Structure formats: structure tokens, C-alpha cells
């Protein structure tokens, strides 16, 4: 028999942010490491061009994506990792996802004011 009143969960939006963070980390961080870690120090990329890009609207969007989504992914992993290790933090979801939300708002204000 199918339950006619299923219990709703707040997890889907969190899983969306978690999945986006993992995908962003896997796809874009190698490129960021290449640019900032190798090309910039060896003078193959001009720092002025990177700064100009960061001040453009698409650059601000890239900064937002590269900072917000991986933080959600990391805090989600920590929250569930602690749960798997039987370390049950009282109101853990509220704490970890609250920290991710505060970080998101902070980054939004910081990047918008660039």
C-alpha cells in the first residue's frame, strides 16, 4: 500500500548544492590550479588580465560559483561523515547548513562589492 501522505524532506536543495559543489570542484579546480599555480607565476598569464576578469560580471559569477558550491559540498560531507563515524552533533544539520548559508551570504556581499 502506498502512503498517501509521504513525509517531505528538506534534503533535495542541500543535495543540489552538494552535487553542484562536487561537480564544480572536479571540473574547474584543475584549471584554476593550472592558471594560478603555474601560468601566473611563470608569467604566461598577465595578472592584470585576471584582475580585469574578476571585476567583470562574468568573473564575479565565476568567483561565486567557485567559492559557494564547493563550500556546500564540503560541509555536507563533514556533516554526513561525522554521522557515519557515530559523532552525532546536536542540530548538526542546522549548524553545518547554517554555516554554509552564512558563508554564501558573506561571499555574495563580498563579490557584489568588488
Curated annotation (Swiss-Prot):
The Gene Ontology terms for molecular function here are: succinate dehydrogenase activity
Q: Primary place of residence? A: membrane
The residues that cross the membrane are 24-44, 50-70, 92-112
Tell me how this protein sits in the membrane.
Multi-pass membrane protein
Q: Which HAMAP family match?
A: Fumarate_red_D
- Biological role stated in the UniProt entry: Anchors the catalytic components of the fumarate reductase complex to the cell membrane, binds quinones.
Protein name from the UniProt record: Fumarate reductase subunit D
Q: What is the organism lineage in this UniProt record?
A: Bacteria, Pseudomonadati, Pseudomonadota, Gammaproteobacteria, Pasteurellales
Amino acid at each position: 500500500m502506498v502512503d498517501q501522505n509521504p513525509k517531505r524532506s528538506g534534503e533535495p536543495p542541500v543535495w543540489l548544492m552538494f552535487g553542484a559543489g562536487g561537480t564544480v570542484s572536479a571540473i574547474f579546480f584543475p584549471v584554476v590550479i593550472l592558471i594560478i599555480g603555474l601560468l601566473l607565476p611563470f608569467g604566461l598569464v598577465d595578472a592584470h588580465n585576471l584582475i580585469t576578469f574578476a571585476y567583470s560580471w562574468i568573473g564575479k559569477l565565476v568567483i561565486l560559483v567557485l567559492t559557494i558550491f564547493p563550500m556546500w559540498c564540503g560541509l555536507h560531507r563533514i556533516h554526513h561523515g561525522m554521522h557515519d563515524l557515530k559523532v552525532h552533533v546536536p542540530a548538526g544539520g542546522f549548524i553545518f547548513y547554517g554555516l554554509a548559508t552564512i558563508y554564501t551570504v558573506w561571499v555574495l556581499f563580498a563579490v557584489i562589492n568588488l
